[in-house]
Amino acid sequence: MYEFDYHKATSVDDALKSLTGATDGKLLAGGMTLLPTMKQRLASPDVLVDLAGIDGMKGIRKEGDQIVVGAMTTHAEVNLSALVQKEIPALAELAGLIGDPQVRNRGTIGGSVANADPSADYPAALVGLNATVTTCLLYTSPSPRDQRGSRMPSSA
């Protein structure tokens, strides 16, 4: 590998600030795709921001009639969640079939969705479930129309 700055973010704002001034900053979720890509020198970020320290991005909970899965929730956590097994059994089963135990215990749903990883077919499952994905903007814009984040149906 090569030299880069590493930051372990403690909040979304901290992660965004860590990317300020980066020419090729990358966000690290589980690292199942990014780290091998960096080792092969196919990606060479000048700043690597680890999201593992952001507790608000982890976990599974029910809010009204919705199941909310945080981006930093691992495949194993999705697979083993009693709530997901009860409410969305197909998603629990999908998560249990991803990779091997090491990948399931480290890889995250957010990393797989953001990377559109074909070996973890969450995007197709999200479309099939008519899920809503909430994102966070990672740039600043002078336009007042831009928001801090956005919500979009997965079928959009």
For the regions a language model picked out, list residue spans one by one.
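Positively charged, low-complexity/disordered segments
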Residues: 144-146, 150-156
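C-terminal structural segment of proteins
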Residues: 1-141, 145
